[in-house]
């Protein structure tokens, strides 16, 4: 074996899913000493129908048995609650829409889990993420690359990883398409070969999100207004809505009036009729008002500039200013933009085309081609003509 594939002790995060299972198998096939770790990150109501880690552990243990590796059950629930869930609640209480999976990767899977693996004498860790790591021969820096399967790429969720973390990390399935991963799992007889991909936030599972959040954040009803200031109904609490949201607004059947349609025509918004869907455009925390607009192309849903804070750069320092691409939400196509300013504290992006429903609390992640440069948490954008000239969440 060459140095890259010489035998190493590698600890794999086995989730019970097919991606981490194939990850462990591929590394074992390369001759490495592979140890599986099942991470338990949530304990509250974990025996419920929505989110049971016990079922996932049974699947992970069955995989380990087929592959022929050891598996250990490790509880990181306290770390998760302190480092991830507490921040998740603070952000929702402030009216923003956080992405806990990004923080979970940075604080749990590639910090607490990595530390545990190193105590076991591991040289590397591996997970079933669809991303790639490459060491730049010219700079010596480790680069985070998109996964080869564009429909499964998860580099967006990994953009906060640093050089120390990437230097110890392997993403074997990032070099494959999902169909290939399923085929390998079928061929070697993995018991979870056809297991459905996990969706949503692990501690919420398949339950209604609003019901879950209401266990921790009290409802605070207030008015729902359109862009003309007309009251359309009542919301249950601003924390329970996100910018761009269309479903669950409680104003189904409300039609635009003549004055509303004339206002839409005056601002050049074409094709808006009385039955067009409504979207959340602004959350005014001071007045507890939820502002909604009609039509997907409403100006209140369009932004060409954004400011992000708490930026993290994969290389350890901010990239050079200039042309690049960015995503303001997962699964969004790369959008051409210019990095106008960048520090560890924050950055400003100017987009070539208007971006839809740029949401404070979500992450803006930057790319140069297939290389993920890092990113930050969206703080504000330049949505025009909002009431009072305030930001979309304020």
Curated annotation (Swiss-Prot):
Region (Interaction with target base in tRNA): 99-101
Amino-acid positions noted as binding ATP in the UniProt annotation, renumbered to this chain: 13-20, 39, 128
Gene3D superfamilies named in the record: Adenine nucleotide alpha hydrolases-like domains (2.30.30.280), HUPs (3.40.50.620), Translation factors (2.40.30.10)
Site positions per UniProt: Interaction with tRNA: 129, 362
Main location: cytoplasm
Record-level Gene Ontology MF annotations: ATP binding; tRNA binding; tRNA-uridine 2-sulfurtransferase activity
EC primary class: transferase
Active site: 104 (nucleophile), 202 (cysteine persulfide intermediate)
Family: Belongs to the MnmA/TRMU family.
Function text: Catalyzes the 2-thiolation of uridine at the wobble position (U34) of tRNA, leading to the formation of s(2)U34.
Official protein name in the record: tRNA-specific 2-thiouridylase MnmA
Organism, as annotated: Polaromonas naphthalenivorans (strain CJ2)
Gene: mnmA
């Amino acid at each position: 074996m060459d140095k890259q594939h010489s035998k190493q002790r590698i600890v794999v995060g086995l989730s019970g899913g097919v991606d981490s299972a194939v990850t462990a198998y591929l590394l074992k096939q390369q001759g490495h000493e592979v140890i599986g770790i099942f991470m338990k990150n949530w304990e509250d109501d974990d025996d419920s129908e929505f989110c049971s880690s016990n079922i996932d552990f049974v699947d992970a243990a069955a995989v380990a048995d087929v592959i022929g590796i050891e598996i250990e059950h490790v509880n990181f629930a306290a770390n998760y609650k302190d480092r991830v869930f507490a921040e998740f609640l603070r952000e929702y209480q402030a009216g923003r829409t956080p992405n806990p999976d990004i923080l979970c990767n940075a604080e749990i899977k590639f910090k607490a889990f990595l530390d545990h693996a190193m105590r076991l004498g591991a040289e590397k860790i591996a997970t079933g993420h669809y991303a790639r790591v490459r060491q730049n021969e010219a700079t010596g820096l480790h680069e985070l690359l998109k996964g080869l399967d564009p429909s499964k790429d998860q580099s967006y969720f990994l953009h906060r990883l640093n050089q120390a973390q990437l230097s110890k990390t392997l993403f074997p399935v990032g070099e494959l398409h999902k169909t290939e991963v399923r085929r390998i799992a079928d061929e070697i007889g993995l018991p979870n070969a056809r297991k459905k991909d996990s969706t949503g936030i692990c501690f919420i599972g398949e339950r209604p999100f609003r019901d879950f959040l209401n266990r921790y954040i009290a409802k605070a009803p207030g008015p729902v207004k359109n862009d003309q200031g007309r009251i359309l109904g009542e919301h249950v609490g601003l924390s329970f809505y996100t910018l761009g949201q269309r479903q669950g607004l409680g104003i189904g059947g409300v039609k635009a009036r003549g004055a509303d349609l004339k206002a839409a025509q005056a601002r050049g918004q074409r094709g808006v009729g009385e039955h067009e869907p409504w979207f959340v455009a602004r959350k005014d925390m001071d007045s507890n008002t939820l502002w909604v607009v009609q039509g997907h192309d409403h100006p209140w849903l369009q932004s060409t500039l954004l400011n992000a804070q708490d930026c993290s750069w994969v290389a350890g320092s901010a990239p050079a200013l200039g042309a690049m691409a960015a995503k303001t939400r997962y699964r969004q196509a790369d959008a051409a933009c210019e990095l106008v300013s960048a520090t560890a504290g924050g950055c400003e992006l100017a987009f070539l085309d208007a971006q839809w429903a740029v949401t404070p609390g979500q992450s803006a992640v930057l790319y140069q081609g297939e290389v993920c440069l890092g990113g930050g948490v969206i703080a504000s954008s330049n949505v025009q003509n909002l009431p009072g000239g305030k930001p979309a969440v304020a």
